[in-house]
Structure formats: C-alpha cells, structure tokens
Amino acid sequence: MNTIRYTLLTVLTLISFHIFAQPGVSAGNLQFTIKKMSDNVTFGVFVKPDATIAPSKRTSTGSGQVTLVTSKDFTYDNLVSKGGTWVENARVNSPIEAPDNAYISFGFVTDEPKIKLQSNEETLLFTFVPADDYDGSISLIENNNDPFSTPNSYGTNPGNDLGMMDFGVAGGIQYYTYANNYFEGMDNGPAILASEKTEAAQPKAIFAAEKGTASLRSPK
C-alpha cells in the first residue's frame, strides 16, 4: 500500500511540476554546458547543480529540453543518451530572426538511465557527433537573449529546461529547475557518466568567451 501511495504521489507531483518547469524559468538550481569529449570529435551536453543545493540520490526528473544553436548547414550522427533518454523533437532552419542559424531541440523522454546529480559535479546527459565537414559553431541557446526565443515567427518553443524533484532532503520535497548555461574557464569538476556510474575529468573545449560557443577546431 505504501508503494502504491508513493507511486501515485510521484505521478501527480510530476504532472504538476511539468506544468511549472518550462523553458524560460528565471530562477533555478541547474546549469547546462556543452563541450568536446576526450576524442576531440564527440560533443557532450552536461548538467551541474549550482552551489545552492546538495541533491540526494532520491531525485526524479519530470521534464527537460536542450536546444542547440548552430549554423544552418549543421548535421550530426550518433546521438547517445547518457543521463535520461533524449530524442530530437524539433528543428528550425534559417528563421527570419536569425537566418544564418539552425535551432535543434532535444526532448527528455524518460529518466532512464537515471540522471544522477552530485554537488559541484557534472552529469553527462547525451552526446552526438557533428558531420566531418562541419566547421561552424555549436552552442546552447540562451533562453532570455536569443533572437529566436519565444515568441518567434514559427510559433515554436525553443529553450533549455530541466525539472527535477528531490525526495531525499530534509524539509520535504525539493524542486530543481534549469537556471542558465555555464562555460569553460569555470571550475567544472569531474563528469559523471550516469549510465556507467564512473567519474572522469573532461577535457577543455575551445569556447568563444563572449558567446559561449564551442569551436570545432582542435586545441593548439
């Protein structure tokens, strides 16, 4: 009976939290970044808790979205989910607001493999490999400043979002939401490969500091 009650509570809370945790929420506790992996070819999208929270192991993810901003000729292969299951669910090429850009959104489907948060550490969400001939930039959308942010000419909802609940902290259920992006030059800590339960320091990607975009050029 206790199991049934807990399951019902989880489902109902996730439904209500999904409504609350939408792209563009201005206050939150979770930060995203994108960088190259150790092979210098694959790109990874990571989440990290900010300094205000200390997540327990009893978290549950209810919603999520990651939107990449690339050149309009961008293509990729080998999308691999590492924390949660992610699928491409929208793409817009050359909108009038940013005709040189493409906006590719990846939606969260299920918390399998589970997204495991740890204080001051990165968790890898998914990876992908850009086409060999692509030499443009790849960055995460800035929800509040991008020219294609909602409302836009396509009536779409690009943006970054992650909504989680923590059942294991004192004081009752805690809610964590996406806050902003962070970039290289910060102390990112070790990465957590959620599906493999291993920790490995990630190499530094080359970023355009003023834009937070990852370059495909190899480090010199």
Task: Annotate the PLM regions.
Residues A21-T42, T177, F183-K220:
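Boundary/junction segments of secreted and surface-exposed precursor proteins
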Residues M1-L8:
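Bacterial N-terminal signal peptides that target proteins for export
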Residues F46-V47, N89-S137:
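Structured beta-strand segments within beta-sheet-rich domains
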Residues V47, K57-T59, L79-P99, L117, ...:
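The transition from N-terminal targeting/processing segments to the mature protein
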Residues S26-Q31, K35-R91:
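Low-complexity, serine/threonine/proline/glycine-rich extracellular segments that form mucin-like
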Residues T33-M37, F46-K48, V69-S71, G107-V109, ...:
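A structural detector for beta-sheet-dominated domains
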Residues L117-I173:
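Ser/Thr/Pro-rich, low-complexity mucin-like regions
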